[in-house]
Design a protein with these regions (language model features):
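Small-residue (GG/TT-enriched) beta-loop-alpha framework at ligand/catalytic clefts
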Residues: 23-29, 123-236
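Active-site neighborhood for divalent-cation/phosphate handling
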Residues: 45-51, 60-170
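N-terminal basic/disordered segments at the start of proteins
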Residues: 1-39
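Residue-level marker for the onset of beta-strands and adjacent loop->beta junctions
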Residues: 16-18, 77, 178
Length: 282
C-alpha cells in the first residue's frame, strides 16, 4: 500500500531533516519517513512490493525498488534498516566485544541452527537495548546486511523486534508486573519478557506454520506457556501483550490477527490481562 500524496511531499531538499526506516520482508520493503523533531511526525509510510519474477535474486529485487522509487536514495539524515535475525541472545552490554559477537551464539544453544565453520553467509551484530544495560547479539544473513551497507550511506541496523519492544517498554514503566511480549511473523515467533522498562528474557522459535489460524494459535500457546512457566510468571499479576503490525504497511496481518484472537480466548482462564496492540514495523 502506497499513499501517492504522501510520496509527493518527499524531496531531496527536505531529506536532511528527516529519517528513513525500512524493513525487508519476503514480499518487499516496508518503509517510513519521519521528521527529526522530538515528535517524529510521519511524513510518508507504506509497503513497496518486490517484482513478481521468481527468477530474480533478492539483491536484484531490492535494487529494482531503488531505481523505481527515487525517494529511497534521498540524502536522509539517518537511515534505519530493520532485519530479522536468524538467532539472538541477550548479553550484558559491558561484556560485548566488537568483532567477537559470534562467541555468544555457539551451536550448543537449542535455538541456534548449526553452520559450517568459516561460513561467510552470516554475520554477527550487537545492538544495545533501550534500557542500555543489555544488548542483543544476533546472527543475520550476511548478504542482506552487506546489501544494506552498500546501498545506503548512513545506515543503522536494528533487530526487527525493536519497534514493538520499545513501545511496550515505555508503556510498562509504570507497572510493577512483568509482561511477556509475543511477536509473530510468518513462521517466526519471538517472546520477550520485561519488567519496569528492563528486558530479562528473550526466545525465538521457528514454528511449523499450521495451515489454519486455530492451529497456529495453539502452537503459539504451547511455546508461550512453556516460557511463562519457565520464568515463573503469575497469571493473576503479570501480563501478555500480543503485537500486530499496523495495516498501513500492507503486510499479511489478517492471519496473525485471527490466530491472536483464538490465542486470547485460550489464555483467558489463565492470564487475567491479555492485550492486543498494533505497532509500526519500521
Amino acid at each position: 500500500m502506497i499513499d501517492q500524496l504522501s510520496l509527493e511531499r518527499l524531496s531531496a531538499e527536505s531529506a536532511p531533516s528527516q529519517s528513513l526506516s525500512i524493513r525487508y520482508l519476503s514480499g518487499g520493503l516496508a518503509f517510513c519517513v519521519r521528521m527529526l523533531s522530538p515528535a517524529r511526525e510521519i511524513v510518508a509510510c507504506g509497503f513497496l512490493p518486490f517484482s513478481l519474477s521468481s527468477e530474480k535474486k533478492v539483491e536484484e529485487k531490492f535494487l529494482e525498488l531503488f531505481y523505481t522509487y527515487d525517494f529511497l536514495a534521498y540524502p536522509y539524515h539517518q537511515i534505519y534498516c530493520y532485519y530479522s535475525p536468524e538467532s539472538a541472545v541477550l548479553v550484558p552490554t559491558e561484556l560485548v566485544t566488537a568483532g567477537q559477537e559470534g562467541l555468544w551464539l555457539f551451536e550448543g544453544l537449542d535455538d541456534v541452527k548449526p553452520r559450517p565453520v568459516g561460513d561467510l553467509s552470516v554475520c554477527y551484530l550487537s545492538t544495545p537495548l533501550p534500557e542500555e544495560t543489555k544488548s542483543f547479539v544476533t546472527r543475520a544473513d550476511s548478504t542482506l546486511v552487506q546489501l544494506f551497507r552498500r546501498t545506503l550511506l548512513v545506515v543503522e541496523l536494528i533487530p526487527a523486534c525493536f519497534p514493538a519492544l520499545s513501545l511496550r517498554l515505555e508503556h510498562s514503566r509504570g507497572f510493577l508486573a512483568s509482561e511477556l511480549l509475543v511477536l509473530l511473523e510468518g513462521n517466526q515467533l519471538t517472546l520477550l519478557a520485561h519488567r519496569r522498562g528492563e528486558v530479562f528474557s528473550y526466545r525465538q522459535v521457528s514454528l511449523r506454520v499450521p495451515s489454519d489460524e486455530k492451529s497456529l494459535g495453539e502452537e503459539v500457546l504451547f511455546y508461550l506457556f512453556a516460557q511463562w512457566q519457565h520464568l515463573g510468571l503469575d497469571g493473576a499479576i503479570d501480563r501478555v501483550a500480543l503485537g500486530v503490525p499496523a495495516p498501513d504497511f500492507a503486510m499479511e496481518v489478517v492471519r496473525e490477527g485471527q490466530a491472536y484472537a483464538h490465542l486470547k480466548e485460550l489464555l483467558a482462564p489463565y492470564v487475567q490481562t491479555v492485550e492486543v496492540f498494533t505497532y509500526s514495523p519500521c
